[in-house]
Amino acid sequence: MEWPALTERFLLYLAAECGLSVNYRESVRRSLARFTEWCRSRELSPQHITEPLLAEYRRLLHEEGLALSSCRIAMVHLRRFFRYLNSRAVIEQNPAALVKGGAVRRAIPETLAAESVAKMLDATDADDIPYGARDRAILEMLYGSGLRVSELVRLRADQISWEEKFLRITGKGGKTRYVPMGTMAAKALQNYVQQARHVLAREGHRVPELFLSNRGEPLTRERIRQIIRKRAASAGLNEHVYPHIMRHSFATHLLENGADLRVIQDMLGHADLATTQIYTHVEAKRLVGLHRNFHPRGRKRD
């Protein structure tokens, strides 16, 4: 049985046998939709799911910037879902039985040095049509505008103001914000739209999303992740590079260069300033390192 059918049976079970509310079931539906999209992108059936794969998925949620509480909720939903599949003999063992939702702690965000970002961008040839142009635009938008990967895959032409160089983004909770595009990001996106997108689009198949796969379908979050990993490797970067690290780098580099924290909050679409303030810890850690390395009283004595 395929993922969609299993999801619907589970939701029916939650309603009919458990008596759970509509709101709770909708929350479960969203969690399972995200998880099953990831499974389908990797051609994983329910029988393929293991405890290490679920731990990998939990790390992915964290890397994509999901709040710790949301990660916990998602893993609670998955534990319940796989317990149900096991009870119905769809799977022989429950791979989620020992997976904990709260194992990922809130840490200082990982970032790339500006030089590493530049190296990856320079190694992605925008004149290589269509994939170089597409991938360069993806990298420029994630780093130049600080988009979430979920916002990037949904980006449409009607959200772009070319003249004023800004994007109209609908983020978490349906909130709209306006995000500036840097000159290089706007140039890369325009190059992709004008020179490459029509090569990827399928004739007679209208797709509103801007970023397309080789089959003319909208790129998924997992495919964006694969593209970024590939481009980082091609640039010779040894760091673990993933979509959300570009957003972290966007915010951190703005802060390092003197941007106001509340302006960064607005551009990131954070409802709470406290969420943005974690980037001040990145800057503080950097300054401590500089002091330790260069100040006469900061270095350890032999």
Feature annotation, model-predicted:
Residues M1-D302:
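Conserved catalytic core of the tyrosine transesterase superfamily
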